[in-house]
Amino acid sequence: MPEINRPLSPHLSVYKWQVANTLSILHRATGVFMTLGSLAFAAWIVSAAIGPESYDRVLALLAGPLGLLVLFGWSFAFFYHLGNGIRHLVWDAGYGFDKHVARMSGWFTFIAAVLATVAFWVGVVA
């Protein structure tokens, strides 16, 4: 059999980067981030069970700038993953496969997640 000088799998340079690529990767990343955040949440709960000193240490860590940034990211991950999960359920029902509709629903999901995150944090701070 003659050797054919071509790639066995497509190269990334062949594909044009699209919103769908980014949203798919973001959906997976937010799922991983929420899982890791759940471990941090469990550590916070365990620290409360250990005693007040441990709880105060964890609370101080979460109330600091880095902790607030992580919590803000965790809440965005929650809202985005929730919205995109609903989007996938709509797809499972057989709707929204038109390219334009899929692109617009992706943007809607992302913008809604940003707005929900900001609204949540405005409610938390107020």
Map each language-model feature to its residues:
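Membrane-embedded alpha-helical bundles that constitute the cytochrome b-like, heme-associated redox core
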Residues: 1-126
